[in-house]
């Protein structure tokens, strides 16, 4: 009987040992890194690639605006056949060409070009903002998978420990040292552990699906990640940095400039326009056996002076001024959002760091408490329920540490993102960076051509 009781106690200690390690010794041999995931997201993320296409679309608006500076040339050809009572059937053909060149349009084209160019700069900043958000989402997706895999592993260890508790409780019952209540309590805790493990595995699958969506590939084995470096020293320093470099703020400032140019362009519609027109044509006539032809050419300058347009021009000017006012307000809106994001990220980072320290101390205390409860249980001073509760306390604090370490990394990158310093270049990612100015230079002064710069 003593041997059987001793064996049951050994099994109880073994269950505690299963929980004594903090997290996953096998993590040392993992292959995928956070930097590698960021590189993949930079290259593969579909919404980010869509934003890049949006910049290229905006580039073409500059070429469209500049087209008003250039001549508009049209050709024409007409043929007709008719007869009058006094003549035979007559076939007439006319071929002609006409050129229209704007000489002055109240500075509308100049301001439209300036607005289009400024909108290109705004779109580039929006792209940089999307790039930052994508990389931050990749960090969050990476850390979510890593955290939830750790939690699932802890749940597996906890289930193994509960299995040991059930076996130990049954062994004590067999030798008369325990009760059926002890066995029932152990089995109930094991059932709870099974449910928690299943939920943890489901969470892992969900996180892996999000990782696939953001990064563009399924997560392999992941290595631990550290917090972002070169963080600001205070919230005020972070906000000062954001005012100078956050792409969201810069984009709204460019939008204000573009709206200002748009107001000037609309006001230009009140001014006279001057245009040059040149044309040439050839007329060929066939009537029976007779043939005739004639050539004409003309050139002229015309002036159009707007007098009244039914209120349309005035309404467009007022509308553009309201759009300018809205754009100025949007600057304040984005600045407030950035300030809030910095404050939130800073608070979360501080709380997570404090939580890491507290939970590390908590693990040591919970492990000591579990060891003590097991020893006291051996001499009858504690019940099986006390042991189960102590084990659950240890698992809870281990999971809390995993979550706190996850939060430190994510909050540090959230702070970096909020300050506007989370681009591929600033993170030092070894990847061929997308350069929007290359497409812009290729199309901004293009006079003709249907193919895009990449050959489509």
UniProtKB/Swiss-Prot annotation:
Alphabetized Pfam families for the sequence: OEP
Record-level Gene Ontology MF annotations: efflux transmembrane transporter activity; porin activity
Signal peptide: 1-28
Compartment(s) of residence: Cell outer membrane
GO cellular component: cell outer membrane; efflux pump complex
Keywords: Antibiotic resistance, Cell outer membrane, Coiled coil, Membrane, Signal, Transmembrane, Transmembrane beta strand, Transport
Residue runs in coiled coils: 312-341
Knockout mutant characteristics: Mutation strongly affects resistance to bile salts and toxic chemicals, and significantly decreases the resistance to antibiotics such as erythromycin, ampicillin, tetracycline, and norfloxacin. The mutant also has attenuated effects in the mouse model of infection.
Primary location class: membrane
Transmembrane listed as a keyword: yes
Family statement drawn from the similarity comment of this UniProt entry: Belongs to the outer membrane factor (OMF) (TC 1.B.17) family.
Function recorded in the entry: Involved in the efflux of toxic and relatively hydrophobic compounds. Influences survival inside the host.
The name this protein goes by in its record: Outer membrane efflux protein BepC
Annotated organism of origin: Brucella suis biovar 1 (strain 1330)
Encoding gene (name): bepC
